[in-house]
Amino acid sequence: MPQVGTYKRHQKEEVIALMGGLPFKADIWDWQFESNPFGYDFDPVVLEEAGQIVGFNAGMDIQVYFNGEIVPALWSCDFFVHKNYRGKGIGQVVKNEQIKKSDMIMSFGISNMAAPVLLKKGWVANKDVALFKRYKKIDSAKKCLLVILQVLNKLLGFLHSSGKSDSEIITTHELSNKQEIDRLWNKVKSSYKKIVVRNYDYLHWKYEKHPLAKYLFLEVRHNNELKAVGVVREHNGQVKLIDLLAHADDSASRLCIIKQLEINFPSSHLFICTTTDHLLQKSFLSLGYFKAWDKPRFFVRAEHDNQEGAMDWFLMTGDSDGELLSASSDSYSIIADNGVE
């Protein structure tokens, strides 16, 4: 019978093999798990039998601004059961152990197989996640219809998006300094009910220290004061708005950042963003994006406020470990294509 174990650093290669041998996982492991921006230790769930890892569930410890307080939380990620032990209840045991790790556990980008397991264990689904797209290239009948929808959305949103902004937007490869980013975060955090702490340490770790991926930053300034920061990534003609730091009511900065995407990437054929932010969603529609039918799942298990704990979150693409993996995979493929060892 498998027993709960304690993760040891020398087991890294065994865990990566359990994951199916992701070619880039070794390159990002220490950054993702051993260099936490909030100073937390890596403490995954490990199930072992006869010296072999048969179940594993990692977690990325973070802090969240939750109804006016800064509290610890855990992003669940990298949940794997050895192929010879599937269908034997090992996954249930792993999740039972993970529940002991944190009073608030969040999961984003959940598979069809994992979703019912989490719901049975007390996770609650968020209803606000939406995926927005804008096609610039028509190569099928379906895309032709979607482009028509984009035009209609833009016409309907013309009054919302046509106002002039007196702000300046700057594209840069580096975040602004720690003092400016932290000042902006402290200014805007209370405008949200629930949001992952987006201070300088977190943003710097996630988007500047990533071992493989490269991100661009869009700074919105008014009279040289930093008002908002957008995080962007492009790969093979697809542009993603990954993250946003701005006041919850700042419509002008949202519109400014979305417009800048097409200015910076005029030849790209697809623009994408996943978000729960209703003002950002409205801004996308007004600028000719459409709301896709498919969307990732976001579940929360909050020990003291479970039914309400999944509601009213500000969430972006970058909150998901799926983006972390996607960025790694895209960057790894570029390295491989260029013949770089």
Task: Describe the role of every protein-language-model region.
Residues 1-53, 70-75, 129, 150-201, ...:
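Short amphipathic alpha-helix that is part of the acyltransferase structural core
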Residues 34, 61-67, 92-95:
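Catalytic micro-motifs at enzyme active sites that drive phosphoryl/nucleotidyl and oxygen chemistry
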Residues 42, 102-104, 213-215, 266-270:
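Short, high-confidence coil segments that cap the C-terminus of an alpha-helix
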Residues 46, 52-63, 75, 80, ...:
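Conserved beta-strand in the GNAT
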Residues 73, 77-83, 244-248:
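Glycine-rich phosphate-binding "P-loop"
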Residues 81, 86-100, 250-263:
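Conserved acetyl-CoA-binding loop-helix of GNAT-fold acetyltransferases
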Residues 105-160, 222, 233-251, 258-341:
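Active-site/acyl-donor-binding loops of N-acyltransferases
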Residues 178-232:
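Non-catalytic interaction/regulatory modules that flank or connect domains
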